[in-house]
A protein has these predicted regions:
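N-terminal secretory signal peptides that target proteins for export/translocation
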Residues: 1-11
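Mature catalytic domains of secreted/periplasmic carbohydrate-active enzymes
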Residues: 30-347
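Bacterial N-terminal signal peptides
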Residues: 14-28
Length: 347
């Protein structure tokens, strides 16, 4: 990328950012959150226009390929799309070594891009935990890798002055109490018995994992829920869960993906008028899927990302860029390259 192009991108970004801040001050993009405590805790987030989400875990091992067959869609949906039984998928833990994982290198790449916050995975749809939970053996510390990913990354983020949050999926294809499964469910191939499963007991498991995350890993800026769509907010005890989270860390931000209003809207596409009446962010990926795809060659150009960033800023929102480290624990070269290029534009 030429220096002239980089300069034009930086000018565009700064001009649009100034315009977006002016629009916000005039009440153009969204109404202010009325509660004073909510205003206080989200103040820093309103100023941050650009975040990164890491999509990584056990699903990076197959990398969208199962038994030699390539599957489309996000890499963290490989178990669903390939219809892999829970026990067969769990056997992947014996192969999880991530020899190239280096939290300092990850943090440097994030800083190179000029991002203001980072979302780290704690538990994805497959139920695999990237922290040392005492409530399950299906976790990263029980693999040959043996290290507490979330501990190392959270410590590194604080040392490098990077605000961070954790991604947590309600959907869990591994936990025996998570429902539905079996016939007449989205996963008819999951033949584990359901007569002893108890969804309320599963939600208690979620609450206890919230306690682990919010009492053992220091201050966390954002709790990024996902995967709540198979149950109603009442079935997920959403209000109770958020109250529990607020009791543990009153200043934490929570998105709206439990089906109840949170501090901000987490969107998957660019909003049109009327714009959301609360703070919002839009998620995109550096390629055509979320997470690591072993056969991927279709990468977005940095110019496309900066255009999306500028558009989000102009509308009063944030861009959340999703990236997928590979099974070795390293950022693929196209990811590192584009993060640096984006950083040249934003600076």
């Amino acid at each position: 990328m030429s220096r002239a192009v980089s300069h034009r991108g930086a000018v565009l970004y700064r001009a649009v950012l100034c315009a977006s801040l002016l629009c916000c001050s005039m009440g153009y993009s969204f109404s202010a959150v009325s509660q004073e405590p909510a205003d206080a805790r989200i103040a820093w987030w309103r100023e941050a226009k650009f975040g990164v989400m890491i999509r990584w875990g056990l699903h990076a091992l197959p990398g969208c390929v199962w038994n030699g067959i390539r599957f489309q869609g996000p890499s963290d949906w490989i178990q669903f799309r390939a219809r892999v039984p829970s026990s067969e998928y769990a056997a992947l833990t014996a192969q999880f070594t991530a020899p190239l994982f280096n939290p300092d290198e990850w943090a440097q790449s994030i800083k190179d891009a000029g991002t203001q916050y980072l979302i780290l995975p704690a538990k994805s749809y497959d139920g695999f935990c990237l922290f040392d939970s005492a409530l399950t053996d299906f976790k990263i510390t029980a693999t040959p890798f043996g290290r507490d990913f979330l501990r190392e990354m959270s410590d590194t983020c604080r040392r490098e002055h990077i605000r961070f949050g954790v991604y947590y999926s309600i959907l869990d294809w591994h936990h025996p109490d998570y429902l539905p499964r079996g016939p007449d469910s989205p996963r008819p191939w999951d033949e584990r018995p359901t007569d002893t499963a108890d969804y309320d007991r599963y939600i208690d498991y979620v609450k206890r994992q919230m306690e682990e995350l919010l009492t053992r890993y220091g201050p966390i800026d954002i709790l990024w829920f996902d995967g709540a769509w198979e149950h109603t907010p009442a079935e997920n005890h959403a209000d109770e869960l958020i109250r529990h989270v607020r009791t543990l860390q009153p200043g934490i931000l929570v998105n709206n993906r439990l089906g109840v209003p949170g501090d901000f809207h987490a969107l998957d596409s660019m909003p049109e008028h009327p714009l959301p009446d609360r703070p919002w962010e839009m998620s995109i990926s550096l390629h055509d899927t979320y997470g690591y795809k072993r056969y991927d060659v279709e990468w977005k150009e940095s110019s496309e990302i900066i255009t999306q960033l500028a558009t989000c800023s102009a509308k009063g929102g944030h861009l959340l860029l999703n990236i997928g480290p590979d099974d070795s624990g390293a950022f693929p070269p196209p990811v590192r390259e584009r993060l640096k290029q984006i950083g040249e534009w934003t600076r």
